[in-house]
Amino acid sequence: MGLKKNMAQRMIHVKEHIPRIHCTGAREPLSCFVVNGHRKRLDQILVDRGFFGSRERAKRAVMAGQVMIEDQPATKPGQQVRPDANLKLKEQDPFVSRGGLKLDHALEHFKLNVQDAMAADLGASTGGFTDCLLQRGVSKVFAIDVGQGQLAWKLRTDNRVVVMEKTNARHLNKKHLPGEIDLIVVDCSFISLKHILPPAVALLERDGNVVALIKPQFEAGKEEADKGRGVIRDPNIHDQIIHSLHQFTTEELGLNWKGIVESPILGPAGNKEFLVWLEKY
């Protein structure tokens, strides 16, 4: 009896030291992680330590080669890692989304000073353009989007940002935006700039500026877009789109076409994009 009792006590002791295993289910069969101070998924640890706001963003960073474990590049978001492992990012994202990189590149290229400007961000989404403008010193941004709940929390709680969700930019007028708007930035999808710019320009003060992202897949005809399954690769089509927008903005809207620059990064589907600078005079 004494032997059996000792064995039972030893088994209980061992059981208490076995870490609990949690799994996320059949859809992610390999996403099990150990929770009692032992190993976890890399993407989960990145979120736990505050590197990223969600596992999805952490996954993208790992797949893009931005995460280092003990000075070695990580390649798998689901890799099991000690919670105390030495983790580093090759380059911290300066903005809440990739869109900020596009606008920042354009403002730098055009040497456009937005300090103290009153701005409107049409198609704000997560807020990459808004974040870029705030970091460059604008006094206020109206973050406008037809969707809801997408704007990053740090922008949503910034007193320089006026959040205007569930708002269609095509229906805006000066009653919606108190104050004088000096600058409008545009990053809209599934709609041509030819539909967005007319009401936007009406909001601008004289000598106000527009910086708009040109997305060829939403400017080309349906036939051209369907050919490449939504990706426009033909440089001749790019030229036609830019020429058509130049003609529309200068002749129909009476704007001054100040310049155009290619985006430093591709769109999500691999589309080449451009940013145009327009001035109201």
Regions found by a protein language model. Name each.
Residues 216-234:
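Short, glycine-/aromatic-enriched active-site segment of Class I SAM-dependent methyltransferases
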